[in-house]
Amino acid sequence: MGVAAVFTAVQSDLGALVSEASNSRSADIDLMTTAQILACMNAEDRKIADAVAAELPAIAQTVDRIVAAIGRGGRLIYIGAGTSGRLGVLDASECPPTFSVPPGMVVGLIAGGDTALRTSVEAAEDDEATGAEDVKAIGLTTKDVVIGIAVSGRTPFVMGAIDYARRIGAFTAALTCNPGSPMADLADIAISPVVGPEVVTGSTRLKSGTAQKMILNMLSTASMIRLGKTWGNRMVDVTISNRKLADRATAMLRDATGCSADDARTLLDQSNGSVKLAILMQITGCDADAARANLEAENGFLRKAIERAEKTPPQS
């Protein structure tokens, strides 16, 4: 579908969307007790994981494209409005401390800019030209992947960004909660979990927002695992930026290698706070320079670097 036709489709009846329908199970929610309200919400929330599971093939395809993009020097770009935009910014902001990636590798853009993170800027989502301008302003290239996030699947700001990304040749995905949406037609791939009507009609920050958060978790986490940012399930690329993370790094190093707390702290000091380097040094007996060389030779994959170091005799 061409972009003009897609934008025309956005004018269709909002009430026809799954996410805007009335939920019969919560029709009398204003008459319920507190316990009944919570039970109703909890029962609806139980449906979210199954809805996400149905989209795993599309999520997997998107992860593979993200991994390939970052591997060739590209970026993962999230863009959305309102709650959807905030969730994208949240996921992007967690990647540098969790996986030690550069801040610009995973980018979150929200309609209305940073002000919209704390204060709603509702009208900002209606301008498709601004969506295109925002991704253009960050120097979007064909190497990048753009994930447009909008529950309705028809937010003009997000559609403008997706349209621009496609026109320059960047890979695009639409994360919506309405299958067959205009955004789904516009993007290269659609991820559309059907969570059903909300307990408060149209309040898509509820089930829909939770589904989006789960999927964003998958997109970033699975991509980083594929890029060698973990060793097993250990978060070995964590950035030590506070006392809690320093304690976590020490505990991780002790658990991974069996060394003492004092040895762990010494290794982390010698490795300049790199858990990966410290583990490699302790397991293989390499010094920091040799460990770093082995990691670089294996593109940061610790498991492969350990195997490489163990096959390489230490230099006298």
Curated annotation (Swiss-Prot):
SUPFAM superfamilies: SIS domain. CDD domains: SIS_Etherase. Signal peptide: none annotated. GO terms for biological process: 1,6-anhydro-N-acetyl-beta-muramic acid catabolic process; amino sugar catabolic process; N-acetylmuramic acid catabolic process; peptidoglycan turnover. Keywords: Carbohydrate metabolism, Lyase. Gene3D superfamilies: 1.10.8.1080, Glucose-6-phosphate isomerase like protein, domain 1 (3.40.50.10490). Its EC number is 4.2.1.126. The active site is at 94 (proton donor), 125. Residues 66-229 form the SIS domain. Pathway: Amino-sugar metabolism; 1,6-anhydro-N-acetylmuramate degradation; Amino-sugar metabolism; N-acetylmuramate degradation; Cell wall biogenesis; peptidoglycan recycling. It catalyses: N-acetyl-D-muramate 6-phosphate + H2O = N-acetyl-D-glucosamine 6-phosphate + (R)-lactate. It holds the Pfam family GKRP-like_C. One of its GO terms (molecular function) is carbon-oxygen lyase activity. Specifically catalyzes the cleavage of the D-lactyl ether substituent of MurNAc 6-phosphate, producing GlcNAc 6-phosphate and D-lactate. Together with AnmK, is also required for the utilization of anhydro-N-acetylmuramic acid (anhMurNAc) either imported from the medium or derived from its own cell wall murein, and thus plays a role in cell wall recycling. A lyase-type mechanism (elimination/hydration) is suggested for the cleavage of the lactyl ether bond of MurNAc 6-phosphate, with the formation of an alpha,beta-unsaturated aldehyde intermediate with (E)-stereochemistry, followed by the syn addition of water to give product. NCBIfam families: N-acetylmuramic acid 6-phosphate etherase, PRK05441.1, PRK12570.1. Belongs to the GCKR-like family. MurNAc-6-P etherase subfamily. Homodimer. This is N-acetylmuramic acid 6-phosphate etherase. It comes from Jannaschia sp. (strain CCS1). The gene is murQ.
